[in-house]
Amino acid sequence: MFVKTLTDFAAEHSGKTLVLLSCSDGYTILLARNRAALEPYYKFACPTEENVMNLDMKEYFYKACEKHGLSYPKTSSCTVQNYREVQLPFEFPCIIKPSNSMAYWNCHFPHKKKVFVAYNQQEFNEITAAIYGSSYQDPLILQEYIPGDDNCMRVLNCYSGLDHKVHLMALGRPLLEEQTPEGIGNYAAILSVRDDALMAKMKAFLEDVGWEGFSNFDMKFDARTNEYKLFEMNPRQGRSSFFVTASGYNLAKWLVDDVVEHKPLGFTIADAESLWMIAPFGVIRKYLKDPDLLAEAIRLKKQGKVSHQLLCREDLSVKRLLWYIKSHLNYYRKTAKYYGNKSLRG
């Protein structure tokens, strides 16, 4: 069905240059798996199926981190067979998250969250029992909690060309994360930053594995060891990757210049000052605890170096504007309701 739908669309638009871009893990796998069937009709950059499977599944990604000298949190796992008896190799709190994001997306149970934090054994037992009481039956990743607020996170977006070389890297420092159950781990505001040492290490990793296309990494700075620890790699753009385009580095340009125009891309590190937001600035002002980062956000706002994800002036009809205002007001409500709640509570 995937291939037929796309080839039918291509037939209806013959004579046009068609570019494919995956926006989910599942579509990246399908694109990689059906590359030969789609290449006659579409232009795209895509990793191999083997690379996707080895790096998208968290347990395999951590093995790749070990091989390439990249740090990650102390990690264990459990299965539906042993989750009641598993012993953690670290102290609570414990992060609990699925190893198979696609399977978890399709499961349902009360108070489901994208990621859980268990602060003691009782909470651990309740959370794992709830997850395995659903249709999700794959392993769970159990991970030590890295201390620090949301602003200790980093998000890295990269584009690797058809030549398997990295051509664009953009690093962001989240100021605040989403707080809703389904939004935990998604970013609500990102400050564009630069860290050459970190980028050099990640560039070497991507080129060593022969990656092609977009990649997105989440990591957190661990002040105890003075290093970044990787959480995951997504084989696509991230939900908040527009922060790169908003800072002046249009992600689509790198893709089109590569797969359509076949231009030499060189190597670019995005380093323009910019603040990207999906949350209202008032929410950031209230919940961002670091005074220096808040001052930086206020400065960028005053200088007009701010982009609002949901605000597009070219699409600002009266109906859209009313929706935008309602959405922002609702953001205050849902942040207050869910702030700090990563347990099995509603």
Task: Give the positions of each predicted feature.
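A short, GP-enriched loop/loop-strand-helix hinge that lies immediately N-terminal to
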Residues: 13-56, 71-74
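Glycine-rich phosphate/pyrophosphate-binding beta-alpha loops
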Residues: 175-187, 234-248
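Active-site nucleotide/adenylate-binding loops and adjacent lid/helix of ATP-dependent enzymes
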Residues: 54-140, 162-163, 197-200
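Phosphate-binding site of ATP-dependent enzymes
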Residues: 118-178, 193-200, 221, 227-229
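Peripheral (often C-terminal) accessory segments that flank ATP-dependent C-N-forming ligase machineries
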Residues: 257-346
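Conserved metal-phosphate-binding beta-hairpin within the catalytic cores
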Residues: 207-242
